[in-house]
Every structure is written in C-alpha cells, then in structure tokens.
From Swiss-Prot:
This is Protein FAM90A18. It comes from the Eukaryota. It comes from Homo sapiens. Pfam families: zf-CCHC_6. Residues 74-89, 97-114 have a biased composition (Basic and acidic residues). Residues 180-197 have a biased composition (Low complexity). Belongs to the FAM90 family. Residues 1-42, 70-387, 415-437 are annotated as: Disordered.
Length: 464
C-alpha cells in the first residue's frame, strides 16, 4: 500500500497543512511576551527600553499600530514630577505678575514730579491734562533718560545762569531752561572759563608776573622771560614780546649766557669746575714715568666738611734731595697699575699756597701737558678698592710764574718693598733736604685749596 502512494499527492498535503497552520494562528496584536524573552540586562537601541533588543518583535518602533508601552522596572523617585503645578488663575497672580504691575505704577507716580521740575526750570505754566491722558506722556517723553531718573534739587534757589547768557532775551532763556537743567557742572565750568578768556588776553604787562599755564604760551605774541640764576653786571631779566618763530632761538642764546655767569661750584661736573677755577694759565705736568690716566665716569664735585689731618708720612729724610717740596700725597694704584704703569687719581695731597714758598726749581720736563680737567674726571672709588698695593706719590711744585707743576714718582719694585730709599733715589725730582713732617690731607680739602689758589691767581693777573 505504501508503494501505491503518489509522491506528488504527499507534497500537496504538506503544503496544505502549512497553510492551515498559518491560518489557525491568532491575528497580529498586542500579546505579552513569554517570561524567558525578557532580560533586564538588554536595552533596545531604537526605543531605549530595557528587556529587549532592536531585533526583537516587542520593540514598539517596529509595530506602530500595536505599540506596547514599556513597563517600568522599578520605582524612580525624584526623577518623575509626581506633583505638577496647578494652572494659574488670573485672580491669584504670581510673583512675576506682581513685579510687572509695580513697574507700571512707578512711572505713573513719577510723572507729577517731572512736571514740577519742568515748571521750576522753564518757568512755563503747567499744562492742563487731557481727558484721555495721552498729552501728558507725549510732553515728557524728551525728558526721559534711560540711564536713570531726573535729579531732584532740594534747595529752593533758582539755578545760576552763566554771564554769557545774561544778555539774551527772556524768551530765549525760557526756551533753553530745559537744556540748562541737563547740563553737568563740569560743562558749566568750562563755559564760564571760556567766557572769561576774553578780558585776560588783553593783559600783557601783568601777565608776565602772574604764573600762566603752558597752553597760554601758544598765543600770537608770547612773552619771553629770561631769569638768570645769579646777578650779572651786563644785564638782568628782560621781557621781549616777539613772534613764536623767534622764541626757540632766544632761549638757546640766553641759556649759555646764564650758565657762564654761574660760579664753578654750583652742581656741575668736575671738568667745567676745574677749568673755571684754575684758569687758562694753569699747566699740570707729570714725571717721565707717568702715562695718560684712563678716564672714569664724571662725578659731581661736592664740598665735604674738613676732616682732621691724619698722621705724617713715613718718608726718610735721607731719601729727599734739594730744597723745599710740596707735601706728597699717598695714592692707591688703579686696577690697571701693574699692566699700564703708574697713573694718577684725584686723591692728591698738597699744601696751601701760603705754606709753600716760591723757590727756583728745575724746569719741568717736556712731556705732553694734560688738561686741568683730567684730574677731576678720575673716580674716587678706585683708590679704596686696592688696600694691599703700594701707594703712589705725587710732588707738587710752585714755579716763579705762579704755575704749579706736579711730578709722579716712579712706582717701587714689588720684590723689595723694604727699601724706600732706593725707590725715591730713582726719581729725578727728589731733593736731599726735607721740610717739616708731612701730613695726610683729605682730597676734598686739597681740591678746595686748589680752587682758592687758582681764583686768587686769576684775580692777580686781572689786576696786572
């Protein structure tokens, strides 16, 4: 019997059974998934719900007609708005509506105050309010400022009017009353100052004595006032009204004249002070071993009080040859003394002209004479920096013609410092006889004496 069955009929039966099974299925609708399909660890990427994936048929994004509401897995307190606000009623306005109402009432209360201020400044009679109330707001719109309310004047006095506006008619004053109310006090001060510039420009003689600002010199005829610091026999203060193009030339011509009349001590650097005090006839010559000293930064010559003289020099009498000499001064060698040879510094000791008699001495050597300003340009700190080095000695001599000549003794050999006699014997200007014991003099005292002696020599030469 099995062999008699047709295979085609068996295939047809199988197809019919499958179709019947499909028909017997329930229609597509919301159905609860089996418990084994729900997995809280899974999350759908389409809808964001937990318990299924994006491929699952439970996803509401795939079946819009029968979308399932994702059930909450647990209570989420604090995230959901369980107590929403009740709808507001107009009878019970909130705090925001109250603030808006107060802001609307404030400008209405300020309107009468603005009207009173406008009436006080302008002097106009108060306008009658219209029945609809539109005219009052339009008239005061130009006075409203966004920055803040109008200033309230507590005093009953009327505002002070500038003198420039005093000559105008009363109609113009009443029209510009509101403009003056908005002007700041600084603006009024500038107007008053500009109005008072007219009569001041006419005063030429009195303007020279009164202190004027720098802007006043830019007029048509500026006043040039030249006031030298010290009185001069030739002329004094002059007031010359000239054009603005000649002022610079006169100032440049007047400044050097005022500087030439100043004394040599008034806060000037050392080279000009030395040239004024020593004069043109002074000549400073040094010994054969001396070289041109290196110039240091110029320092102002300040007069210090005289200090008590220190102990005498330790110079043996047998080492000095010849007649009377000036007091030799101890000098510390500069930093380059070992390489460049001996050099001079302004810490030189000498005696006053009254103590040093004029005696015939040997003529000075034909060495190039250094200017007198060179001695003052040396730094005073170079000598104090080398305490362990051997001191240098300079001899000052008074010649017959009233000039001074100085000679620098040769530096001693550093190998035998115990023999000062051999060191002094090498100098061609050393004499055999010795004067009274020499004492050390501060350099400030010596420089002051040198200025006095040179000024006396200049006066003697002028008398001759």
């Amino acid at each position: 019997m099995m062999a008699r069955r047709d295979p085609k009929s068996w295939a047809k039966r199988l197809v019919r059974a499958q179709t019947l099974q499909k028909q017997r299925r329930a229609p597509v609708g919301p159905r609860a998934p089996p418990p084994d399909e729900e997995d809280p660890r899974l999350k759908c990427k389409n809808c964001g719900a937990f318990g299924h994936t994006a491929r699952s048929t439970r996803c509401p994004m795939k079946c819009w007609k029968a979308a399932l509401v994702p059930a909450t897995l647990g209570k989420k307190e604090g995230k959901e708005n369980l107590k929403p606000w009740k709808p507001r009623v107009e009878a019970n306005p909130g705090p925001l509506n109250k603030d808006k109402g107060e802001k609307e009432e404030r400008p209405r209360q300020q309107d009468p105050q603005r009207k009173a201020l406008l009436h006080m400044f302008s002097g106009k009679p108060p306008e009658k309010p219209l029945p609809n109330g539109k005219g009052s707001t339009e008239s005061s719109d130009h006075l409203r400022v966004a920055s803040g309310p109008m200033p309230v004047h507590t005093t009953s006095k009327r505002p002070r009017v500038d003198p420039v506006l005093a000559d105008r008619s009363a109609a113009e004053m009443s029209g510009r009353g509101s403009v003056l109310a908005s002007l700041s006090p600084l603006r009024k001060a500038s107007l008053s100052s500009s109005s008072s510039l007219g009569p001041k420009e006419r005063q030429t003689g009195a303007a020279a004595d009164m202190p004027q600002p720098a802007v006043r010199h830019q007029g048509r005829e500026p006043l040039l006032v030249v006031k030298p610091t010290h009185s001069s026999p030739e002329g004094g203060c002059r007031e010359v009204p000239q054009a603005a193009s000649k002022t610079h030339g006169l100032l440049q011509a007047a400044r050097p004249q005022a500087q030439d009349k100043r004394p040599a001590v008034t806060s000037q650097p050392c080279p000009p002070a030395a040239t004024h005090s020593l004069g043109l006839g002074s000549n400073l010559s040094f010994g054969p071993g001396a070289k041109r000293p290196a110039q240091a930064p110029i320092q102002a010559c300040l007069k210090f009080p005289k200090k008590p003289r220190l102990g005498p020099f330790q110079i043996p009498e047998s080492a000095i040859q010849g007649g009377e000499l000036g007091a030799p001064g101890n000098l510390q060698p500069p930093p380059a003394a070992t390489e460049l040879g001996p050099s001079t510094s302004p810490q030189m000791g000498r005696r006053t002209p009254a103590q040093v008699p004029s005696v015939d001495w040997q003529p000075p050597h034909s060495t190039p004479c250094l200017p007198t300003a060179q001695a003052c340009t040396m730094s005073h700190h170079s000598a104090a920096s080398h305490d362990g080095a051997q001191p240098l000695r300079v001899l000052f001599r008074r010649l017959e013609n009233g000039r001074w000549s100085s000679s620098l003794l040769a530096a001693p050999s550093f190998h035998s410092p115990e023999k000062p006699g051999a060191f002094l014997a090498q100098s061609p200007h050393v004499s055999e006889k010795s004067e009274a014991p020499c004492v050390r003099v501060p350099p400030s005292v010596l420089y002051e004496d040198l200025q006095v002696s040179s000024s006396s020599e200049d006066s003697d030469s002028d008398l001759e």
